[in-house]
A protein has these predicted regions:
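N-terminal Rossmann NAD(P)H-binding glycine-rich loop of SDR-like oxidoreductase domains
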Residues: 29-46
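N-terminal Rossmann-fold cofactor-binding loop
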Residues: 58-63
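NAD(P)-dependent short-chain dehydrogenase/reductase
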Residues: 162-164, 170-230, 266
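Mid/C-terminal beta-alpha module of Rossmann-like enzyme folds, strongest
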Residues: 214, 221, 234-289, 331-332
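Conserved Rossmann-fold NAD(P)-dependent oxidoreductase catalytic core, especially the SDR/UDP-sugar
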Residues: 27, 96-99, 104, 122-164
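Amphipathic terminal alpha-helices
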Residues: 2-21, 303-334
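NAD(P)H-binding glycine-rich loop region in Rossmannoid oxidoreductase-like domains
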Residues: 39, 64, 69-117
Length: 334
């Protein structure tokens, strides 16, 4: 599979996505569209919507190739630093907003940037798009670590996570909630755990280490994952679920997956003996996404399919985005 074929797969809308978006009125704007998921989500929205409904993708666009590719697929791109209030004020109106901006890696070294990106920036955006349906990308890291026996954290669990990054993500949610209360903005908090693209993600991290003969740390002993195409579809479909007070939705796969088991599976598929380091801790970051399955149906790509495709990608020298997830972090430091 080529990168072009992979992007087509990740941006392929489901029938449900097409039906959902076509029932909603107005244009759609993706804020923070230049990250790992943004380009394929914007392309999926473009593929799902009629031609007369515009899709905007807003980012600083450090990569010009990403911008050119989006334009080639009918997405209107806008270069903008979302921390600049005047620039945000000049963005086009849209009835539907997918907010994907945020900062994670490097929090330990520059916490002030993380707090600016995850708490100040949301205030600027929420004020600008106060009447739009808004899906806010969040993370399962806002929860406390939990046991595998619990089945994962649920949407109404108390937020008591480890680490400064996680608290900045709670701040993002609180800011959007404040503006939802003040303005009646229909909002959904999209708490996502580990989207999988063959070029990055937990599965790529584990598979590449097994392939290269590097140790796999199993201290964070269990994880949840979901195919990025399914996560994109669920995010777009969640626009129809946005409400006031804001709705919270955990989004990930059904399985609570052993990292040791993953390493063994990749060892079998790649004909390598995995090197295991560490010992599984009693607690891990795990989400219970049963509500998303009830509301949005099943995923289109199974765990087995993701594992097989990732092994093939790594074995055949597929490119990497060079962005490890650092899922192994058990103290919340990134």
């Amino acid at each position: 599979m080529s990168p072009l074929e992979l992007d087509e797969w990740l941006s392929r809308p489901t029938d449900r996505t097409i039906e959902t978006l076509r029932k909603l009125d107005g244009d759609l704007i993706v804020l923070g569209a230049g990250g790992k998921m943004g380009p394929t989500l914007a392309r999926m929205a473009r593929r799902a919507l009629p031609a007369d409904r515009r899709v905007f993708a807003v980012s600083r666009y450090s990569s010009s190739s990403a911008r050119v590719d989006l334009e080639a697929h009918g997405v209107q791109t806008i270069s903008c630093d979302l921390l600049h209030r005047e620039a945000v004020a000049n963005l086009p109106d849209a009835a539907n907003v997918v907010y994907m901006a945020g900062h994670k890696f490097g929090t330990s070294d520059a916490p002030e940037l993380t707090w600016m990106m995850n708490s100040v920036l949301p205030a600027i955006v929420a004020e600008r798009y106060s009447v739009a349906r808004t899906v806010v990308f969040s993370t399962g890291c806002v929860y406390a670590l939990t046991s595998t026996a619990s089945g994962g954290s649920k949407e109404d669990d108390v937020l008591a996570p480890p680490g400064e990054y996680a608290y900045s993500c709670i701040a993002r949610e609180r800011v959007f909630t404040h503006f939802a209360k003040s303005c009646g903005t229909p909002t959904l908090m999209f708490r996502l755990n580990y989207a999988i693209d063959l070029r990055y993600g937990v599965l790529y991290d584990v598979a590449s280490k097994v392939w290269q003969g590097k140790p796999v740390d199993v201290t964070m002993g269990h994880v949840n994952v979901i195919w990025q195409g399914d996560a994109n579809a669920r995010a777009l479909e969640s626009l129809a679920l946005a409400q006031y007070p804001p709705k919270i939705l955990n989004v990930t796969g059904r399985e609570c997956i052993s990292v040791r088991w993953l390493a063994e599976q990749f060892g079998r598929l790649l004909a390598r003996t995995p090197i295991i380091t560490g010992q599984e801790a009693e607690l891990a970051w795990l989400n219970n996404a049963s509500q998303s399955f009830e509301l949005l149906g099943d995923v289109t790509v199974s765990l087995e399919e993701m594992i097989t495709a990732t092994a093939d990608w790594v074995r055949n020298g597929g490119v990497s985005l060079g962005k490890p997830t650092h899922f192994e972090s058990h103290d919340g430091k990134f």
